[in-house]
Amino acid sequence: MEMESAAASTRFHQPHMERKMSAMACEIFNELRLEGKLCDVVIKVNGFEFSAHKNILCSCSSYFRALFTSGWNNTEKKVYNIPGISPDMMKLIIEYAYTRTVPITPDNVEKLLAAADQFNIMGIVRGCCEFLKSELCLDNCIGICKFTDYYYCPELRQKAYMFILHNFEEMVKVSAEFLELSVTELKDIIEKDELNVKQEDAVFEAILKWISHDPQNRKQHISILLPKVRLALMHAEYFMNNVKMNDYVKDSEECKPVIINALKAMYDLNMNGPSNSDFTNPLTRPRLPYAILFAIGGWSGGSPTNAIEAYDARADRWVNVTCEEESPRAYHGAAYLKGYVYIIGGFDSVDYFNSVKRFDPVKKTWHQVAPMHSRRCYVSVTVLGNFIYAMGGFDGYVRLNTAERYEPETNQWTLIAPMHEQRSDASATTLYGKVYICGGFNGNECLFTAEVYNTESNQWTVIAPMRSRRSGIGVIAYGEHVYAVGGFDGANRLRSAEAYSPVANTWRTIPTMFNPRSNFGIEVVDDLLFVVGGFNGFTTTFNVECYDEKTDEWYDAHDMSIYRSALSCCVVPGLANVEEYAARRDNFPGLALRDEVKYSASTSTLPV
């Protein structure tokens, strides 16, 4: 376990003392200790002596309480020899007993945690664990996780283990610790549903890298590790050329039935398509998604809806997670920031909202936060840094060019510079530290203009116009470009899409979607650009498709359960309770019911 020694140290402060004592009392006793007055104990460590007060040491450590008060010990004893600790660590522990602060650095954290554990000083243990959490990286996550085998640090262990699972692909590329895992440790990692890999090829390649580090002693372990790969989810060509024909696999008799079963499962998937029953087969069971795409609210069946569905990209399934107590909302914005989903502005067929609601996806609770300065239906929303930006929209009277941003820490909205044009039904995103907004409707015509906001200068700059007018557009940053997708040009709903290069200040067309749509949700999940629902010119739709910039092609994804437009989407990564938003991997009765309920399509005209 290595950490950058140049990293800044942290002075940990324990706000709640293990034994309550006023700050003034602590300060006075520390002055007495430093002056050598009223001390009633001497702690000896490797020839070094530390004078102290027994009651102060007892206040933070059950070890010292037992040492000074046990029946077999002489309570009048003054000098104690303490083995198994260095003088430097004992000095820090005694200082902590008096001041409740301790400097924690990459150089001392391991020894300090060991010493705090030895003396049962939970304040320092907690401080060291928090420090190690903050230092987790690709190079040290395995070492930190193993370090917790020796000490009771369950939260740190969980954090480190989930870091390994969530960052597996990148960690394998750079971590020397990965190559030193035992076969059991590696097996335990790669069999987990939580392992975050976009393709199972990455798991197989990791196994090969681990074996190649010591092939003579490790090649026989291929029979233990290969069944933990979801082989039937691989592309057939990769499986046949790279797995089935691999020398380690071919030389293992135990791998032959695994290959046969994988081929059969792959054939069944190809012929019949995936079903929930496949989730019980370890060769076809999809991993849990690292990120969940939420599709929130919208316009359905002639009225706004409160429906919320969660998309599990690894299983290609939608899960109904609607909170029935929440009121319906359409033409709103959605944003994820620092653990919360924010629902911003919108319309319920009666009122135009300036209100903002915050959803905690772990606790599943909703709270109202500060309202915007303006009512904003058809609002454009995006996140940059620590702020949520809300731009344009319609307040029930006029289309807006105003913009504002929200800071969760202060729970305040602040106006920023207005845009060059009034824009409702536009869409916004962020790329390279700037906010982009494209298209929309100004009250007279659909727009093909676009502009960019510089947060440092608080200025909007007009950029190259799009190739098509687009209101009800979807805009998203994907790779190195800003994508503008679909929308309404004043006559037709569009299938077309285009990509903007900030470097060249130019737009280029990309392949068209399968279906025309406006007022849909748009997000990027697992390096794919998803478009969700919308209005096709005749009806609302539950159709979903995705674009892969690597292949420059669109693909069909699983339909939502609910036909709707005017919805908003956002992506939530790294949820601790992701299973509650993902397709069920177990075999409980009725597990498919929550995914299969569908609502009638609306053929109503959308509100303008």
UniProtKB/Swiss-Prot annotation:
May be a substrate-specific adapter of a CUL3-based E3 ubiquitin-protein ligase complex which mediates the ubiquitination and subsequent proteasomal degradation of target proteins during spermatogenesis. It is found in: Cytoplasm. Pfam families: BACK, BTB, Kelch_1. Pathway: Protein modification; protein ubiquitination. Self-associates. Interacts with CUL3; indicative for the participation in an E3 ubiquitin ligase complex. Keywords: Cytoplasm, Differentiation, Disease variant, Kelch repeat, Phosphoprotein, Repeat, Spermatogenesis, Ubl conjugation pathway. The keyword Cytoplasm applies. Signal peptide: none annotated. This is Kelch-like protein 10. Residues 39-106 form the BTB domain. The keyword Repeat applies. It comes from Homo sapiens. SUPFAM superfamilies: Kelch motif, POZ domain. GO terms for biological process: cell morphogenesis; fertilization; homeostasis of number of cells within a tissue; male genitalia morphogenesis; male gonad development; proteasome-mediated ubiquitin-dependent protein catabolic process; protein ubiquitination; spermatid development. One of its GO terms (molecular function) is ubiquitin-like ligase-substrate adaptor activity. GO terms for cellular component: Cul3-RING ubiquitin ligase complex; cytoplasm. The modification Phosphoserine is found at S501. It is linked to Spermatogenic failure 11: An infertility disorder caused by spermatogenesis defects. It results in decreased sperm motility, concentration, and multiple sperm structural defects. Oligozoospermia is usually observed in SPGF11 patients. In addition to oligozoospermia, teratozoospermia and moderate asthenozoospermia is observed in some cases. PANTHER family: KELCH PROTEIN (PTHR24412), KELCH-LIKE PROTEIN 10 (PTHR24412:SF172). SMART domains: BACK, BTB, Kelch. Kelch repeats lie at residues 292-339, 340-386, 388-433, 434-480, 481-527, 529-574.
